[in-house]
Amino acid sequence: MKTNLSSQIKLDRIPKRYYAPDGELELAALTRDEKVYTKIFEGSEEGSVYVAHDVAELIQKCKAEHRHCVLALGSGVGTHAVYAELVRMYQAGEVSFSNVIVFNIGEYYPLAEGAPGTMSLLKELLLVKVNIDPENIHSPGKLVSKEDVYQYCK
C-alpha cells in the first residue's frame, strides 16, 4: 500500500482553476461542498510560506489586541520549512514573538538521559532564533514523574 502519494500528484496536468481559482465566485463554486477549508499549493515551499505568514498574522493580531498568542508546536518534518520562514520574518523585522506562549505538543516520554527530544529540535529550528521569552515555553521535561505528567500538562 502506498502511503505517500502527495509527491505523485502532477499539478501540471490539472488546470490551475481546479486548485487555485481566480476569483471568489470560482472559489465558492469549487469549495461549496467542503466541510474543511483546504488550500492546495504547487509545492511544499509555497505552502510553508503561506502557513508561516498566517501564523505571523495571528501573532500580530493578538499583539494589536494586547493579548498573548498561544501556539501549540510540533516538530515533524512538515513544520521545518514553516519555522525557517518564521525565523526569516523575525530577522527581517516582520514579526515579533514577544507576546507568544508556546506549548510543545509531542514530547517523547520517558526521555532517556542525553537523548534529543522534540523540544531540543523546536529550540534548534525556531525558539532560540526568535525573541520568545523562555518562561513562555512549556514542555514536559525529563524531571516530570509519570504520576505528575497529567497535572503538569493541565
Predicted segment positions?
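Glycine-rich N-terminal segment of FAD-binding domains in flavoprotein oxidoreductases
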Residues: 65-92
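Acidic/polar N-terminal loop/beta-strand segments that form early-domain functional surfaces
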Residues: 41-43, 74-76, 105
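Generic structural signal for well-ordered alpha-helical scaffold segments
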Residues: 52-63, 87, 91, 123-127, ...
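Ligand-binding beta-strand-loop-alpha-helix segment within the catalytic cores
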Residues: 21-35, 95-154
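A broadly structural signal marking compact, well-ordered functional cores
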Residues: 55, 77-79, 84-85, 102, ...
